[in-house]
Amino acid sequence: MYSQEDHIFQLCSTDLCASYVPVINQSVLVTHIVNYEDYLQIQASPLQTSQPTPPEELHTVGYVFTNDGQQTRSDEVNQVATGHQSKQKRSRESKRHSSSKRRKSMSRWLNKQEDAAVTHIVCEEKINNDQPAPDNVLSTAPPWLRDMAAAGISSTSTRDLYATVTHNVCDERMENDQLQLNNVLLTFPPERVNMAVADFSAMSPRDLYATINHNVYEVRMENNQPQFNNVLSTVKPGHINMAAAGIPAMSAKDAVVNLNVHGEKINKGQPAPDNFLSSVTPGLINVSGDGATVTHNAYEEKMENGQQAADNILSAVPPGLINTSEAGIPAMSTNDLYATITHDVSEKKIKNSQPATDNFLCTVTPGLINLAEAGILATSTRDLYDTATHNVHEEKMKNKHLITPCQQFHWDLLICQELLNFFIWIPDATVIHNIQEEEMENGQMPPDGFLSNSAPLELINMTEDCMPLNALDSFSYDFTSLSREELLYKHDSNEFAVGTKNYSVSAGDPPVTAMSSVETPQISPAMAKKINQDIKCQLMKEVQRFGQNYKRIFILLEELQGSMKVKRQFVEFTIREAVRFKKVALIQQLEKVLKEIDSHCHLRKVKHMRKKIIVI
């Protein structure tokens, strides 16, 4: 016989309007549940506990069938005792049945994290059709993946539930010239939060125990009406996209560096209020060490629609991959963080037939800097302990207005320069480049451009300039008359000879004749080895090509540096590559070259033996 205690199931709503208790008579149990759908919803609700305490009054409705076929309806209020109930004997089936019911009700709560003390308290207010919408309160949300689109939070995930990190966000907007009520989002856990309103996308805290705050203040102008303040405070460090501050893709790697940004703009001829972004953590910036003292100070002024825009100041920017296009310094990277390097950039431009003022770029770091306006491409400092300074001053001619180019560079020690596919190796020599350039722009002759002082210890590609070169240590010739046909290579001595030829700058310019003394700068073994390695790679590619045009292969073999023994090794290597790809015609031609090298070596040996005999 079933006991009443084992089969009491309660249906609880917010006002306890109805509940259910089975009625037992003559060992026949037939029950009717009031509002069964509500019962199922409450069973799946996380607010319902596994074993609720029964109330004092339960409104029961039941139908009882007796053996004689009669049906009676009981609709009464039963007093249920809350104290100790009498113990009754239970059968094995009843015990199994009751235990399985309890396991099912408790199974969905067994995996719940009880130690996590993270709470989501979300309060949101909106205005719909000029009427205040009632409060939408989402409280005590558990710390797992939930979609809270109403609060502007998508794909939230708690990484560390024991970290005490709080996001306090206050947002105000103007819609249809009506003030929208405050939308307050507070006490968000540290996780990936998508705050499109705050211009923060894909935030991820790297270190949850770091105390870093983002204090953001923003004001905008919309339809000539001042927008109310949008205050975003105490935001955790992470991937933050602050396009207004010109700092994209930020990631906190050093918790001690702050970005102080002040910006002003003019929209439709009206000055916009101050857009102030302060105490922002460093972003996707290449900072591998903490001991670096590097500062970027940028100053910029522009003219828009005939009105002078307010000063846009970007100060105290940490070192790294920063795109300062207004200052003409993209893709900057500091390789040595123990060097004290400062970027002071000042730029002013005026358009629409107004003379531009001096554009001055001073004390630029020795890094991978692309100064296209200064005529320098791909400069790289190899020795980071060397103190290097770049002083650049430039003016240009546009629309028949005179702009003077004036550029200066101060560098030290050794030069290895590539000019018109020509490599120069100068060991232990100090070389000075004095460069003078004149160009015709719109019928006006700009003043002389001058590049002075010593050259750096790196490869510099300055193909746009015609550079007269003055070198020390018996290495002096004029590059103004240099062209590709003037480089005469001597295979026997591994030297280049520079001759005298006519050189014309362009089709319309008169030919320029320059005299230069013939010098033979030797190529070092390291440089020769590098050239041969490049030739080897090119030979492999040429052999793999389709077709029977092998002219390029023999040109590369003639450009090899070194003795005949080295050339023989490269010819044998090329033959092996041709055998791999079954190039029969190429193999036959290379075998002829190999025979010529062998005969040449044999003749040199014979001459050497004759000299020895004569000496004896």
Swiss-Prot record:
User: Pfam families, from UniProt?
Assistant: INT_SG_DDX_CT_C
Question: Region entry Disordered: which residue ranges?
Answer: 69-110
InterPro entries membership: INT_SG_DDX_CT_C, Integrator_subunit6
Question: What are the Basic residues biased-composition ranges?
Answer: 86-106
Residue spans of biased composition, Polar residues class? 69-85
Which segments cross the bilayer?
none
According to its UniProt entry, the protein's GO biological process terms are: snRNA 3'-end processing
Give any Gene Ontology cellular component.
integrator complex
Q: What is this protein called?
A: Putative SAGE1-like protein
Q: Which organism is it from?
A: Homo sapiens (Human)
Supply the source organism's classification.
Eukaryota, Metazoa, Chordata, Craniata, Vertebrata
